[in-house]
From Swiss-Prot:
It comes from the Eukaryota. Component of the Mediator complex. It is found in: Nucleus. This is Mediator of RNA polymerase II transcription subunit 30. Coiled coil: none annotated. One of its GO terms (cellular component) is mediator complex. It comes from Aedes aegypti. Belongs to the Mediator complex subunit 30 family. The lineage of its organism: Eukaryota, Metazoa, Ecdysozoa, Arthropoda, Hexapoda. Keywords: Activator, Nucleus, Transcription, Transcription regulation. InterPro entries: Mediator_Med30_met. Pfam families: Med30. GO terms for molecular function: transcription coregulator activity.
């Protein structure tokens, strides 16, 4: 019987002894695969399936629990297969059989430990993803909210800041108008040469650019005025220019106080003025009549002398 097999196979069970070597058994135990080498049919497909399950077990926690149950079921000893194996073994394989009997006791413990580690790692990954915040930043939500609130407060300008910006805008508008007047003062009519045409075109472009900028500044000034008017509780009332800028050479006039007595006195004054005007008219008529009468008397006296 020994001559029918190659030198590497000393017995009919030599190939089974090679697969049951201690190095192969340790690698399989580290991978968490149950000890199925003592069975008659060594199924490589089952080993590959178990390896794929172990690789996928680090990502999902559900399959790991099912795999641990399958491993425990597969790790239960099968007395029928053990008896069959004992009948087919030869005396030269006693040492290998002893190792195989010790390895089934170690492999369930290693498989359960590997399954527990996979389940715990999957649970940690699930909790890490559900939490939404990285491990190094446990309180990132409140910090972000406080930063956003501070940014909103910084963006809100008070009334004094808006007035200062409006003053700077007015000064910018005045300076740009001065530049426009300076450019218009220096413009000369084109003389027909290329240099004259180019210079006039350049000045025209500068003037247009200045007017475009002035238009934008006026829009900005209007927005600032509306913002200040909204912030003011009473609103921005119109004030006379005379009260802000006193005119030189103009006498100061006290504005009358509009009271009931003042209104009555004003009405009486108007009535008296009308009466005086009527009396003046009557006196004028009387004077005219007296003049005519005197003229007639003088005429009669002159005719008698003749």
């Amino acid at each position: 019987m020994s001559g029918q097999y190659p030198s590497g196979y000393q017995s009919p069970s030599g190939h089974r002894g090679n697969f049951n070597s201690p190095m192969m058994q340790q690698q399989l135990n580290q991978m968490g695969v149950p000890n199925q080498m003592g069975m008659m049919g060594f199924n490589q497909g089952n080993v590959m399936q178990n390896q794929q399950q172990m690789q996928s077990g680090g990502v999902q926690s559900g399959p790991d629990i099912g795999m641990g149950q399958n491993i425990q079921q597969q790790q239960q000893p099968n007395p029928s297969q053990g008896t069959g194996q004992g009948q087919q073994q030869q005396p030269g394989q006693g040492q290998a059989q002893g190792q195989q009997q010790q390895n089934p006791q170690q492999s369930p413990q290693l498989g359960m430990a590997a399954g527990g580690q996979a389940v715990s790692s999957a649970a940690q990954s699930a909790t890490g993803t559900v939490g939404g915040a990285p491990p190094g930043q446990p309180n990132a939500g409140p910090v972000a909210s406080t930063q956003a609130a501070s940014n909103v407060q910084q963006k809100e300008f008070n009334l004094l800041t808006l007035c200062r910006i409006g003053q700077e805008t007015v000064q910018d508008i005045v300076s740009r108008f001065q530049e426009v007047f300076g450019l218009l003062r220096g413009i000369q009519p084109p003389n027909g040469t290329n240099a004259g045409l180019s210079s006039s075109n350049d000045k025209k472009a500068k003037v247009q650019e200045q007017f475009r900028t002035i238009r934008l500044l006026f829009k900005r000034l209007r927005l600032l005025y509306d913002k200040c008017n909204d912030n003011c509780q009473q609103g921005m009332e119109y004030t006379h220019v005379e009260s802000l800028i006193p005119l030189k050479g103009e006498p100061e006039r006290a504005e009358p106080i509009h009271t009931e007595e003042y209104k009555k006195a004003l009405q009486e004054n108007r009535e008296l003025i009308e009466i005086v005007m009527l009396k003046n008219k009557q006196l004028r008529e009387i004077i005219d009549k007296i003049r005519l009468t005197i003229w007639e008397i003088n005429t009669m006296l002159s005719m008698r002398r003749c």
